[in-house]
Amino acid sequence: MHSSLEPEKMEEGGGSNSLKRKFSEIDGDQNLDSVSSPMMTDSNGSYELKVYEVAKNRNIIAVLGTGIDKSEITKRLIKAMGSSDTDKRLIIFLAPTVNLVKQQCCEIRALVNLKVEEYFGAKGVDKWTSQRWDEEFSKHDVLVMTPQILLDVLRSAFLKLEMVCLLIIDECHHTTGNHPYAKLMKEFYHESTSKPKIFGLTASAVIRKGIVSSPSNYAAQVSELERLMDSKIFNPEEREGVEKFATTVKEGPILYNPSPSCSLELKEKLETSHLKFDASLRRLQELGKDSFLNMDNKFETYQKRLSIDYREILHCLDNLGLICAHLAAEVCLEKISDTKEESETYKECSMVCKEFLEDILSTIGVYLPQDDKSLVDLQQNHLSAVISGHVSPKLKELFHLLDSFRGDKQKQCLILVERIITAKVIERFVKKEASLAYLNVLYLTENNPSTNVSAQKMQIEIPDLFQHGKVNLLFITDVVEEGFQVPDCSCMVCFDLPKTMCSYSQSQKHAKQSNSKSIMFLERGNPKQRDHLHDLMRREVLIQDPEAPNLKSCPPPVKNGHGVKEIGSMVIPDSNITVSEEAASTQTMSDPPSRNEQLPPCKKLRLDNNLLQSNGKEKVASSKSKSSSSAAGSKKRKELHGTTCANALSGTWGENIDGATFQAYKFDFCCNISGEVYSSFSLLLESTLAEDVGKVEMDLYLVRKLVKASVSPCGQIRLSQEELVKAKYFQQFFFNGMFGKLFVGSKSQGTKREFLLQTDTSSLWHPAFMFLLLPVETNDLASSATIDWSAINSCASIVEFLKKNSLLDLRDSDGNQCNTSSGQEVLLDDKMEETNLIHFANASSDKNSLEELVVIAIHTGRIYSIVEAVSDSSAMSPFEVDASSGYATYAEYFNKKYGIVLAHPNQPLMKLKQSHHAHNLLVDFNEEMVVKTEPKAGNVRKRKPNIHAHLPPELLARIDVPRAVLKSIYLLPSVMHRLESLMLASQLREEIDCSIDNFSISSTSILEAVTTLTCPESFSMERLELLGDSVLKYVASCHLFLKYPDKDEGQLSRQRQSIISNSNLHRLTTSRKLQGYIRNGAFEPRRWTAPGQFSLFPVPCKCGIDTREVPLDPKFFTENMTIKIGKSCDMGHRWVVSKSVSDCAEALIGAYYVSGGLSASLHMMKWLGIDVDFDPNLVVEAINRVSLRCYIPKEDELIELERKIQHEFSAKFLLKEAITHSSLRESYSYERLEFLGDSVLDFLITRHLFNTYEQTGPGEMTDLRSACVNNENFAQVAVKNNLHTHLQRCATVLETQINDYLMSFQKPDETGRSIPSIQGPKALGDVVESIAGALLIDTRLDLDQVWRVFEPLLSPLVTPDKLQLPPYRELNELCDSLGYFFRVKCSNDGVKAQATIQLQLDDVLLTGDGSEQTNKLALGKAASHLLTQLEKRNISRKTSLGDNQSSMDVNLACNHSDRETLTSETTEIQSIVIPFIGPINMKKGGPRGTLHEFCKKHLWPMPTFDTSEEKSRTPFEFIDGGEKRTSFSSFTSTITLRIPNREAVMYAGEARPDKKSSFDSAVVELLYELERRKIVIIQK
């Protein structure tokens, strides 16, 4: 090998290229500052224009060197393609990294007037549907994305390449091998019938590492790139164009001597240390295996970390010297010190790595000067530093180069290094070297995807610092340097030779300033480096004629895949579509599946045309996988669903001309107050109701009284056509008169005012909702329902009267006033002088028989009942309703307001009881009011006064209907709502159709199972859902355990999870359309309408769907927290929490179990589509398999255990297997039985709690089960019953854990509360569960016998009165109920976690501290300390619940002797600093929110409100937020705020039309008062 290359060898390959330098120039230390040709530019951009013209006509790969503005070319090309007159086709710009995507997107947006958008994985595009992609394609013209995104979109057939007119590929030299660029071209471009134009951009056509041995080798790589991209390399002829317009770059080498050999003694010491600590890690790994924790991957990580650190230190030692090797060890040590591990074993591994690096530091330190082991004075001792090996010759030359920059502050230098460790240690060296203090140095390395946010921020900030001269020396790696936007520099130094031609070419692009340099470091006498540089400089890019035809296309690849040919979607073995991983997860494999192995399962999955998983078949997913929080069945996701109609309420009799036959159901009402009479009613339906629906009772809760409603069937009844008309009149008249309106239209709205029953009301009678509610004669027998036709006929006569005589227009056509007697023939002679007669609009009545008479106002259509005739009053009496109105008398009021001239103004006024809206009578709000809003002592709640109307009798028409009928009509909306709910429950029961002997399930149970907590009822699905969850888990576990005897516990758990997961239950539930039956909204009586009733409170549908049923489409899903759950539109659409759909399935399983046991619940599961079953033969087979196992008893090892559990096993091996830990390495262990026993105990305990505590609420039931069913509780059961002594094990770590647990088992906590600081080993809880599983099999699935054995073992089970919540949760709930906030602070010193909780009471700041292994345990201990302090002040969860008091009832004042000294933090801040609040948000709810955040921040208790209401017949006027509002009610609230260490502040707000607005007003007034007292400062 020659030491230099002759000139003729430099010219090999022909042609003269000024970039090819003669190697004879490299062998000397020539002056690197030789002057080059001045830089030449062309203001017209001739070169860019030439490239653009060629790219416009054909596919090219533009090799753009230094100084060429590729943005200008891209802009011209995009503008030309984007402005074409053809149909819209997309322009796609591809960049290989996310940083480049963002950078190019910003540049393109600034350059072109088109709609540009960027796409990459972090935007969640992997989950986008076809509709979402279609929206993106339609809204944007230019799409900038990574190639993998485009590849996935094409594979899913969301996009076809025919829709693209231009494909720009940046850094296109990556189009090789398995890069997404190459896959894109092979799979789609060459297959496309209408190909887009290709424009490739690169600085070098070849990227591959290694030495390019010959021009032909290089040309072959270029040819391969051209074939794949269907394009030609474009370079100007002999690069004259480039050299003409590119910046001049001066290039020169720096030669350095080889590094002297390091001390063999030192290297041997380092190697010995590495082997020693590596062996320590291996020993820890062996111990980890004994504990049977899955630690192999973690140990491999630590071993790899140890080896990497060792190699990095050796690299620095060989190439940079002793000092840098010492610095490298420091860097590695800092990194390992930042590692936090919770496991003791992992902490030991981390400690081993740390001790290794400390040992390395100590070993290297011996060879460095003792006075300063970091640095030497390079200015004075550079030669001795090199000789001693402290600094390598290469590093010395770098420092000499940097020293030449002294005094030139404008000098900016980029230094390219191969390894990150090189950049880090040299940066440290430079910063510590005093002679280089004039340099501002930083390093920038590759952006690892796992890098934290601060590191990613530095990737952006460091180049900016370099550009503005704040950093003049920047170390970078070639990975960052390629494609990264690094600012201009005056010197580019390749400290390590570039490995690829692309990297070499890119390195030249950064030296773009005038008189710039490009410097290579070369080792003297190193032929490998010289040859490598030679090949890098011989970039033999073939210059071809731009007008020549393109190279032949790449042959289409062989596709081993699965897809939909019609639309082009496909999955291939190397597909990145997630369905391949999903498919692979369904296979049981010992090793990770290969890409080819994933493909067959993909074909078995049910996929849609876009290869997304459809809902048609159950997806078997891995257990406990971290699915999206907004997936199906999650709490976060809300879904729009329709509401199923009750078929029993439908009818076709509306148009029958011959009458109709009905099924009659009588409603009887009985009040608990004697003398209160309610009329019975009859419900007439076309359908026959189920027995338990047609005969039901319910309680109706009125104010201070209870009415029992009972429904009973009364057989068939037939109505003639005439009777039907009158019956419909009655229903329309009363339901509209009392809950709606009888007069429709308004002059103010420009519509004619009409009597409702004079108009066409057929639209109010819909066949899906057709029934009649008619009064029944009061003396009727309970078993029959005789319609009260006298009342109905009276109503019909009034309807006819109003059609002719209602005062609708109030003035005649000439604008004259109307006389009430004009044209009303039915009126008696007004000259009648009988003093006891009262003249009504349609009749006269005796004055003494007016009480409870039902009347209707003929000018408003409102229905009243008469209380009395007011003596000494008449229409000429002073108008007292509104003194400020200006009306002198009632007669004047009616004359001026309505244009009515009264014919009998001297008659006494009628005192009338007004009709009101319907109320929800199904919930006992009286009881709830006592619990939630009981006023504080001394403030007795006043009963609201009754508001009566006063009208002249001649404006009233008498209706001969008892007032008891009106009273009953107020009850009917609630009765019908409950009855309709039961009809739906019965309808669902018929669909499920469980025909099992001696089985029946009530509609009430079904109704409970479909009612959520958001529906304010006295029942909900929660308890049944809790039970159903356990039943389903138990059944699924038994089914899998018996069906798959060869599967291990992990496989069984994954399959069970796939069955019982919320997402699977959601899929099955929606496939059965159960979502329409779910009741999740409050009953709104004002929106309930009877057939024929006009709704006063319509909610028009704005859901974007015309049908009642809502399809399962992502556009009807949301995560919006402001969505109102359960509030339906008039089409029945409402938002439902996705988890409620899954919970409904479990609740129905629970309901069927309660009614019919496991057989009924199994039927329910099968109806849903859950494939589970109990085959008795499988149980026998399982016992037979166990019985055949060889078992030789050893000294009665099982007899003692059988005695403890009081059961003798028929299959002894079951018990042997149940106590065998896997550490014994037998062919069996307890894991499968533990899987079964876990579900058995969960089910048995849940069933016990469900049956024992029937009145316990769902929340407390969940807490009880959690307290009973957990591994810690079972571990205590094992120790208490001495079952742990029978656990067969051979694991040192487990043995230690058990012994430690036994020692701390009886150790009391310092707070006196049972918070074990040591968690029980999982194996102890597992053995209890495995024994339960063994017992279940041995008893042939006899659950009662298993419970007989385990109930005494588990006793005493926790009871509601002894339930102890986790301390932190208990504190949180207690403070929430009392209106107090607390502040939490957590920290971790690497050994233990510390937690501090501060709670501010009225006059004392309480502090609780805790220190434990984890933050959770530390918080629990801190909360426990606080709860203990609160209990001393008689503040606890039990006392507040027991006394049934609110936060205002609890005495929070402390005796002065008990007061704790406030911390200096609290006293000083409160005494000196006045806190700021606001600015106040004046929108509705804004002031309350502002005060809430302030109280939370400063630990002030939440305020309390006391509200008074005033009602009026005439509307109040309010000015609220600059807007005028009117309301018949006025609310005024008083707020009380307890400020710590001050007197309570009380302030009243202004009157407002609603209660919440009055709260806001009170808060605003309070805040201004606080500011006046200088307690707070309100920010403007």
Swiss-Prot record:
Q: Which organism is it from?
A: Arabidopsis thaliana
Q: Where is this region: Disordered?
A: 1-22, 581-601, 613-638
Q: What is this protein called?
A: Endoribonuclease Dicer homolog 3
- Domain RNase III, residue spans: 985-1157, 1198-1340
According to the UniProt entry, which residue ranges have a biased composition of type Polar residues? 581-597
Residue ranges for motif DECH box? 170-173
Subcellular location, principal = nucleus
**Role of this protein:** Ribonuclease (RNase) III involved in RNA-mediated post-transcriptional gene silencing (PTGS). Involved in the processing of repeat-associated small interfering RNAs (ra-siRNAs, derived from heterochromatin and DNA repeats such as transposons) by cleaving small dsRNAs into 24 nucleotide ra-siRNAs. Plays a role in antiviral RNA silencing. Involved in the production of viral siRNAs derived from the cabbage leaf curl virus (CaLCuV) and tobacco rattle virus (TRV).
